[in-house]
Amino acid sequence: MENGAAPTAPAVIVAIDGPSGTGKSSTSKAVAAQLGLSYLDTGAQYRAITWWMVTNGIDTDDPHAVAAAAGKPEIVSGTDPAGPTITVDGVDVAGPIRTQEVTSKVSAVSAVPEVRARITELQRTIAAAAPLGIVVEGRDIGTTVLPDADLKIFLTASAEARAARRSGELKGADVHATREALIKRDAADSSRKTSPLAKAGDAVEVDTTALSLPQVIECVVTLVEEKRAGK
């Protein structure tokens, strides 16, 4: 930093992967804020392109139609962990992308190779431009998007714990139905041909089932600080 400020820690790129309901978003945002890093929710980008497909009448069950439209929407992600934003063609879609309709279609859209290529390129560009480093959360960050990330973390939790957390986030959601939906999405994301949900071989696995959010955050912050100290 200029103006006689204390030298900053080396820029660090942190990849946090895992299925839904493991605490990825809450952990990633808090860690980024605590360490002065940028933050990127890659799931929101896939939700955003899915929302655009639905809004524009694209049949999300037709991979050819989805592939043909993949390059059309302009998706912009704000990376401030205190208030991350996402817009599509200039429209704020932070709320609309969290609907049940988008949630039910995002796996199918995300499985289309042309969509993954488009969004992956966008994610790499954002990560490379982060001045002090970035925490990037998703499902294939450590394996595909940023295989050279300084630190890779894979969050896990039991299906029951994840369902309870997700149903708390989705107003009025039934825990049993949420659990079934999570298991179905895990299967879809883990079995897709292009960039499946998977733990990188060099990732640190953190089971969040019995941990409070502050405990998970503390664990990840410690891992990042150890990695930065060794750079």
Curated annotation (Swiss-Prot):
The record's section on InterPro entries has: Cytidylate_kin, Cytidylate_kinase_dom, P-loop_NTPase
> Which PANTHER family does the record match to this protein?
CYTIDYLATE KINASE, CYTIDYLATE KINASE/PANTOATE-BETA-ALANINE LIGASE
Q: Report which reactions are catalysed by this protein.
A: CMP + ATP = CDP + ADP; dCMP + ATP = dCDP + ADP
The answer on whether this UniProt entry bears the keyword ATP-binding reads yes
The entry's family comment says: Belongs to the cytidylate kinase family. Type 1 subfamily.
Q: What is its EC number?
A: 2.7.4.25
GO CC, alphabetical: cytosol
Q: Which Pfam families match?
A: Cytidylate_kin (PF02224)
Superkingdom of origin = Bacteria
Is tRNA processing among the key words of this record? no
Q: State the protein's name.
A: Cytidylate kinase
Q: Where does ATP bind?
A: 18-26
Give a GO molecular function annotation for the protein.
ATP binding
Gene Ontology biological-process entries = nucleobase-containing small molecule interconversion; pyrimidine nucleotide metabolic process
The cellular location(s) given in this protein's UniProt record come to: Cytoplasm
Q: Which UniProt keywords apply?
A: ATP-binding, Cytoplasm, Kinase, Nucleotide-binding, Transferase
